[in-house]
Amino acid sequence: MIELKDGRIVAGERVVIGDLSFVAPAGKVTCLVGQRGCGKTLLVRSLLGLWPLEKGFATLQGEPVTRLSAPWLRRLMVYVPQELPDSLSDALDVLDEGLATGRRAVVADDPFVAMSEERALLLANRLQALAGEGRAVVVACSEADVSHFDPTATLVCQIENPSIRQS
């Protein structure tokens, strides 16, 4: 499970996301949805312990992310960054390599960018299968990308500056 409790994310002087809370349970895909520039990438970085929260805390399996060392976080979580050079094959390689070591959570930052519909569906199916195996899967994506996932196994958190709503 990945959780964010009362988190506030600031960039410079601007509150990007304010006072947000959500739970990404094991067994579900949780989509963090919002328009470009709304703070999805900063939110992902905060979940990974790479961007500080001005307020609140993020936890992974009940442990505050800020108390976990970077090597320990890498043992617990697979991160699929937005900037992968060769889209689908690299995204799947990152997943497979990370999961071979027993990691229990996946966080992906806009992984469908520049992918064809067919490739996006393949990646979404793989992420959905990982959730079905009991992993917490968090995907920052656009509203259109949510359609790649089975709605009965997906939670959607709509990001609206400076807040978030979970449905």
Where are these regions (language model features)?
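Conserved beta-strand
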Residues: 4-7, 15-25, 56
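Short coil-to-beta microelement around the adenine-binding A-loop and adjacent beta1/P-loop entry
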Residues: 14-15, 71, 121
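Conserved lysine of the Walker
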Residues: 40
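Helix-to-loop junction immediately C-terminal to a conserved catalytic motif
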Residues: 48
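Conserved ABC transporter NBD signature motif
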Residues: 56-64, 73
